[in-house]
Swiss-Prot record:
Membrane topology: Single-pass type II membrane protein
Motif DCXHWCLPGXXDXWN motif in this chain: 387-401
Protein name from the UniProt record: Protein trichome birefringence-like 14
InterPro entries: TBL_C, TBL_N
Subcellular localization, as worded in the UniProt entry: Membrane
GO biological process: xylan biosynthetic process
Keyword Acetylation attributed: no
Lineage per the UniProt record: Eukaryota, Viridiplantae, Streptophyta, Embryophyta, Tracheophyta
Segment forming the signal sequence: none
Known function: May act as a bridging protein that binds pectin and other cell wall polysaccharides. Probably involved in maintaining esterification of pectins. May be involved in the specific O-acetylation of cell wall polymers.
Cellular component terms per the entry's GO annotation: Golgi apparatus; membrane
Miscellaneous remark of the record: Contains 2 motifs that are conserved in esterases, but it is unlikely that this protein belongs to the catalytically active pectin esterases.
TM spans (from-to): 11-31
Gene from which the chain derives: TBL14
Length: 408
């Protein structure tokens, strides 16, 4: 008797379960069912999130867009870190429309910079910039960004820890190092325009000639690499005959002066040096597992109608007159840096193409005065020197740092 009732009960439960399943299916396939829409939305968000996390953002492709929150700091107030020659507001530039744009990468979002978040992320870390004056601009930009462009007496000058002190008779030290004590974050810059090791050839007369060892990274980098958590390298604009001869640099490889014609070609010497320093650094990275290394591509020049010393200028003041977008294979990527870091653990910080669009953001004629001729009687007029190499700050190097921070 009890077995029969049990069988009937199980049959009723099974029938009810089947009916319930059918109702759920009908609800899910109904186009007007809100539950269906919610489930599909969850699935879409999950898929989108998975896709974003699995793909690598190419920050070099994208477009410049207007942003009323710019600039990130004041060119008037960041005097503690910013050289006056690069502060176009201090130097009297009358137009500042170039400040009101940010870079929007294609297909991904670049986090909005927040100095407190940045310093917290960089707690107990050291960020080092090693390169030429454009590297120094990026360093000063990051100091202004991290301090909010405000005087920060609590920030400590720790240059002495890295041997960055002004030598007797020098105009300035070879670099600077500052520490934010609240997070123990150190940001430093070392001047090495060629990223090669420079050694006086005559110790009794150091200014005479300097051996430029193309196959050796700067001694500063070799000596302090173990203290860095993040490293950004750059070189480029000192690789010309005038700079090398003017600095009395004599190129060396394997400890001996270069004799072959191949490396006497400045372009080949530059290519050789960049590949050499990248190869050396990549070999060091396994020994310093916490170190993240970047090689920044070259910053473009925008001289027209001549060069810096022949009346060249970049007097355009209209933002984005060259266009606003970099897509596909557009751009002028630094092929030498790209080749050097290919297959290494070093990341490329590609800023060339996006900076190429911003010719109006250079210092131009805001800074430099006309050159004084040696003999006025021999010169009827002296052209104004325009700076179409360096950038106004605040300005384009702030964007370089945003791309850099997004990739740390």
């Amino acid at each position: 008797m009890f077995g029969g009732k049990s069988h009937i009960l199980r049959g009723s439960v099974s029938l009810a379960l089947i009916v319930l399943i059918l109702l759920v299916i009908i609800l899910l396939v109904s186009e007007e069912n809100p539950l269906r829409d919610s489930l599909f939305e969850v699935k879409r968000q999950f898929s989108s999130s998975s896709s974003s996390s699995s793909s690598v953002c190419n920050f070099a492709k994208g477009k410049w867009v207007e942003d009323r929150k710019r600039p990130l700091y004041s060119g008037f107030e960041c005097k503690q870190w910013l050289s006056s020659m690069w502060s176009c507001r201090i130097m009297g530039r009358p137009d500042f429309s170039f400040e009101g744009y940010r870079w929007q990468p294609e297909g991904c979002n670049m986090p909005q910079f927040d100095r407190f978040t940045f310093l917290t992320r960089m707690q107990n870390k050291t960020i080092a910039f090693i390169g030429d004056s454009l590297g120094r601009q990026q360093f000063q930009s990051l100091m202004c960004m991290a301090s909010g462009g405000e005087d920060s007496p609590e920030v400590q000058n720790v240059g002495w820890e890295y041997g960055l002190v002004k030598a007797k008779g020098a105009l300035r030290p070879d670099g600077w190092a500052y520490r934010f004590p609240t997070t123990n974050t150190t940001i430093l810059y070392y001047w090495s325009a060629s990223l090669s090791d420079l050694v006086p050839m005559n110790n009794t007369d150091p200014p005479s000639l300097t051996a430029m060892h193309l196959d050796r990274p700067p001694a500063f980098m070799r000596n302090y690499l173990h203290r860095f958590d993040v490293l950004v390298l750059n070189t480029g604009h000192h690789w010309n005959r005038g700079k090398i001869e003017g600095n009395h640099w004599v190129m060396h490889v394997n400890g001996t002066q270069v004799e072959g014609e191949y490396l006497k070609d400045i372009r080949n010497a530059k290519d050789f040096t960049i590949h050499s320093v990248a190869k050396w650094l990549d070999a060091q990275l396994p020994l310093h597992p916490r170190l993240k290394a970047f090689f920044r591509t070259i910053s473009p020049r925008h001289f027209k109608n001549g060069d810096w010393n022949t009346g060249g200028n970049c007097n355009n003041t209209v933002p984005l007159s060259r266009g606003s977008e970099i897509t596909g294979d557009d751009g002028s990527i630094d092929a030498t840096v790209e080749s050097a870091v290919n297959g290494t653990r070093i990341k490329i910080l590609d800023i060339t193409a996006l900076s190429e669009l911003r010719d109006e953001a250079h210092i131009s004629g805001s800074k430099l005065k006309p050159r004084k001729p040696k003999k006025a009687s021999n010169v009827t007029s002296t052209p104004t020197i325009n700076d179409c190499l360096h950038w106004c700050l605040p300005g384009i190097p702030d964007t370089w740092n945003e791309l850099f921070i997004a990739q740390i």
